[in-house]
Amino acid sequence: MDVFKQSEVWFVIGSQNLYGPKTLQQVMDNAHQVVNSLNNEAGLPVKLVLKPLVTTPDEITALCREANYDTACIGIMTWLHTFSPAKMWIGGLSILNKPLLQFHTQFNAQIPWKTMDMDFMNLNQTAHGGREFGFIGARMRQQHSVITGHWQDKEAHQRIGQWMRVAAAKQESQQLKVARFGDNMREVAVTEGDKVAAQIQFGYSVNAYGIGDLVAVVDAVSKGDIDTLVEEYEATYRFTDAVKLNGDKRENLLDAARIELGMTRFLEQGGFKAFTTNFENLYGLKQLPGLAVQRLMQQGYGFGGEGDWKTAALLRILKVMGTGLKGGTSFMEDYTYNFQPGNDLVVGSHMLEVCPSIAKEEKPLLDVQHLGIGGKADPARLIFSTPAGPALNASLIDMGNRFRLLVNVVDTVEQPHPLPKLPVARAIWQAQPSLATAAEAWIIAGGAHHTVFSQAVGVDELRLYAEMHGIEFLLIDNDTTLPAFKNEIRWNEVYYQLNR
């Protein structure tokens, strides 16, 4: 999944004409060097494009208007090399609808103590030029990010890269289409929500399709295409005897391949990058899509079970954020606990649908086994465990007057014992700060039982994503205490009531 290749971030230098052509030319010469260095040496996921110097209100407004309509531009990164009076930026910033990053840097890393004169001081004015720019952002109540550090500093590079990933995720959010096969699982509350409010807030559209629409595409898949896909399965996974050629569940595997091909074509034809299924709405399908969903998630699609469109959209957004990073991202559900002093654990899984991007095994096991829910034939699925390491669980919930993004930092552990009778993929983790505190805080905050589990994306990216969209962000980690967490929820309730 290469979502960054066609994207760019515009690097914009603000100044004013009173400095004269010689100084302004030096500013642009320095900017060229900074941009070339960042593009070639910083490992940024998105290309920086240096734009012409802006020195007047009209130039700034024209540039912001152009950025809004350029589909390749996912955001603007500003540098106040000199002093740029911020009233000049009001018109442009008031219409800008792309993410904005202020890079508070300067060309020189250290002060040239022996040679510094007033010419040097006038040229290198980030220290106060950046504050002027920051004031107008604060005065306009406009969300914008600030990163401070020298342009050759690796920590600054990392933070710029994080911002770029989130800016790309916001762009994806604004054009994302989510398909719901069937409706919500009956009587379930948290998977419901205001789809119109979500489209206004995030940009993505959510629409439902009858299972018959999908079945028609599935039934049209040819035997030749099925055989080709099964050959891919055989090269990619370990097979149990039941699904090998002449195995007693071989036909179930062929049916699963047919469903995958049909779902893929339906999603591609409709331009969908996320989808949901529901085991209560399977009319016309021979089995619950398990293998198909797992493989589609690995290809970058978002997914939510039981009609959970919010989790499906969030999963796709995290897939975009985590592109090219180590670790995977998957649909997940807190399934069962291990209550043991000093070793409290959570087993995360789902009926079938866990993404192989988080698999520890190089070749997951492909099997067909009974599923006692849904009333259909035994479904195919990939079975694997998850490697140890840092991770998080994220949940997007509709609170009525706002959306809340809830995140719990967890530590994934190696599976402590074999699970010979558990025929599904799983992850096992220790919740921060403890299972008791994490679970109580999650429940108090109304967190869903479905989550997005990621070993690729971190807390900083998700906090920034929430800031870019103006939604609530709550974090449960090693610093969390329940009294403080409850107070934060109370304060947030007041803020969002007043900030309608």
UniProtKB/Swiss-Prot annotation:
Its EC number is 5.3.1.4. Belongs to the arabinose isomerase family. Gene3D superfamilies: 3.40.50.10940. Pfam families: AraA_central, AraA_N, Arabinose_Iso_C. InterPro entries: Ara_Isoase_C, AraA_central, AraA_N, AraA_N_sf, Fuc/Ara_isomerase_C, Fucose_isomerase_N/cen_sf, Lara_isomerase. Pathway: Carbohydrate degradation; L-arabinose degradation via L-ribulose; D-xylulose 5-phosphate from L-arabinose (bacterial route): step 1/3. Mn(2+) binds at residues 306, 333, 350, 450. CDD domains: L-arabinose_isomerase. Homohexamer. One of its GO terms (molecular function) is L-arabinose isomerase activity. It is an enzyme of class 5 (isomerase). GO terms for biological process: L-arabinose catabolic process to xylulose 5-phosphate. This is L-arabinose isomerase. Binds 1 Mn(2+) ion per subunit. It comes from Yersinia pestis. It catalyses: beta-L-arabinopyranose = L-ribulose. One of its GO terms (cellular component) is cytosol. The gene is araA. It comes from the Bacteria. Keywords: Arabinose catabolism, Carbohydrate metabolism, Isomerase, Manganese, Metal-binding. Its cofactor is Mn(2+).
